[in-house]
Amino acid sequence: MRIFKTSVLVALLALLIANAGFAQSGNVVQGKYFDIYYDDCDLTEVASKLSAKYFLHIDVFSQDSRGSDIKSIIGQLFDSIYLEVSDILDIHMYSFKGVISIMPNKVGIHDILSAYMTEPPDVPAFYFHERNTVYVSLADMNLGILSHEIAHAIIDKYFVVTPPAKVQEVLAGYVEYSIRKSTGTLPAR
């Protein structure tokens, strides 16, 4: 019994050490709903890729926020995306807290997925349920992709019994479609 307890303790300690830098390396922006971690990323590029003009929930250009730095603007922007996705899903969890990790490109995404899959898919972003973390490639980031993954995070935390994967994809796809339609970024027919 003592060997078992020691083995479990060592395994947990190793897991904690290994996970310490998994999503929380580098710089951080703290928002109300997300802690946003980034390495080798220009936050002005992040803001420009997410078209801040669209959001009803953000007021970064108000008199009070003109002196704000880019980190507070990014925090407000991601909070606004969360609120917009919540409105589309009609799921409002004001106590929600998640993590977003911005990787410079798909290589970072691939490296994380490689630790869990033998042949990881080539994706620009994904939501990792066990860590309540959205991973997104800055090179491929757009409002639709990020909204889709945030929808997965909301769906995952809202339902007591998580819906099947296909149902989650339909809901997240609807969010992405709604955002892209509202911003005029749907592909031409």
Ranges and model annotations:
Residues 30-69, 154:
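Acidic/histidine-rich, surface-exposed loop or edge segments in extracytoplasmic proteins
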Residues 10-18:
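Bacterial N-terminal signal peptides
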Residues 128-147, 159-163:
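Short pre-active-site segment immediately N-terminal to the catalytic Zn-binding motif
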Residues 1-9:
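Bacterial N-terminal signal peptides that target proteins for export
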Residues 162-189:
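Post-HExxH zinc-binding segment in Zn-dependent metallohydrolases
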Residues 144-157, 169, 173:
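Active-site recognition of the HExxH zinc-binding catalytic motif
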Residues 24, 69-130, 184:
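Auxiliary, metal-adjacent structural segments of Zn-dependent hydrolase domains
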Residues 19-23:
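Sec/Tat signal peptide C-region and signal peptidase I cleavage site
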